Amino acid sequence: VKVDADTVLISEHLFDRIIDRFSSEPSLEVLSIGLHDFYTDTIINGLQISRNTVRWDFSKNSIFTDIPILDPKSYVFDTAVLSPAGEHSPNPSIPQAFHYGVHRGIKSIQKIHSTTHWANMQKVWHHFLQTRDVRLGFAVLGAELVYAGTFNRKDQDYTNPRMGEVLCTYKGMDAKQLEREIRRLRFLHWGFLPDDLRRRVLRYKRGKLDQNWDQT
């Protein structure tokens, strides 16, 4: 069972029910259980459980570290029975939210598996506009700085100080200031285009041309 550091489980019986699920379905190799996500306020693909026969390819320097080598027929994404298994990042700090945005921004411009992450960042943007929670604003700002070319895939590492240095330049911004800065960045970097066209332009420019794609 892979429980990320920013995930809080909410059921004391969850592990027993997971064991029962795998015992009753011998062909099941990977079970992913939906989590309630603070950023999007939706259920996201989150808690991943793998049978001990599952293998991963660690030879590639991939943004998507959780994708195993398996037959898709042996994979289940549960959004109804055991979901929500927990809360994803229920109370992030501003640096955590900013890092989330940068990381998801990089994921959303990849050659593959990018569409869902792009859609989720648009949900975070709308969630911010509804709630005015500055943590959501800083998450969107992080992604927009990826789209602006400020950050690349090397900058998302927690050991790289550059993300913190850039964040300091926005220190103390309130929701109104964040919205203004985000809208400015969006306009300057193809935000005037229809959403899906902007995604494809950024995927090509920031992803492929700026060499932020996974090397396959």
Predicted regions and their residues:
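Short alpha-helix within the catalytic core of nucleotide-sugar-dependent glycosyltransferases
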Residues: S11-S23
